[in-house]
């Protein structure tokens, strides 16, 4: 049997993002080179264009903690078998932030067949810009 490097992991996906942590997962390589994957090497970039080894893990997920709110972090993963490491996965990049706080209750004005709804912006965006508001009419 010939053993070769595994294929890289795929589909890095953020599972949980907070102001100080990001949990992400990936799909294990479908071609493992004739030897099971032993572990995964996680690398990250803290927004300074310099990739750094973070940790080896034996499962296909990782939680990066101690992050700074409002900073974008990028990660890639390598799979390792008995022969060696795969090429790097495609990178995943996420912003350490949570949902913004709720804006003040809206003011509603009804005039004939028109309804005008207005509100003040949320007092805190928690490190991420507010890009839209959703209005539900019940």
Question: Where are the predicted features?
Answer:
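Pro/Thr/Ser/Gly-rich low-complexity, intrinsically disordered linker/stalk tracts
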Residues: 1-35, 69, 83-129
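Short beta-strand elements bearing conserved aromatic residues within extracellular beta-rich modules
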Residues: 39-42, 132-135
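Accessory recognition modules or surfaces
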Residues: 44-45, 57
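Solvent-exposed strand-loop boundary residues in beta-sheet-rich modules
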Residues: 46-50, 83
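Short beta-strand segments within Ig-like beta-sandwich modules, predominantly Fibronectin type-III
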Residues: 52-59
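Beta-strand-rich modules
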Residues: 64-86
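Disordered, low-complexity "stalk" and linker segments at domain junctions of extracellular
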Residues: 78, 113, 120, 133-137
């Amino acid at each position: 049997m010939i053993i070769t490097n595994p294929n890289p992991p795929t589909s890095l996906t953020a599972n949980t993002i907070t102001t100080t942590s990001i949990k992400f997962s990936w799909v294990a390589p479908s071609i493992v080179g004739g030897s099971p994957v032993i572990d995964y090497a996680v690398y990250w970039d803290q927004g300074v264009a310099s990739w750094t080894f973070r940790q080896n893990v034996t499962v296909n997920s990782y939680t990066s903690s101690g992050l700074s709110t409002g900073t974008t972090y990028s990660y890639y993963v390598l799979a390792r078998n008995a022969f060696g490491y795969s090429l790097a996965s495609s990178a995943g990049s996420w912003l350490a932030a949570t949902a913004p706080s709720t804006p003040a209750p809206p003011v509603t004005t009804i005039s004939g067949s028109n309804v005008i709804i207005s509100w003040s912006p949320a007092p805190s965006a928690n490190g991420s810009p507010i890009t839209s508001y959703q209005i539900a009419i019940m």
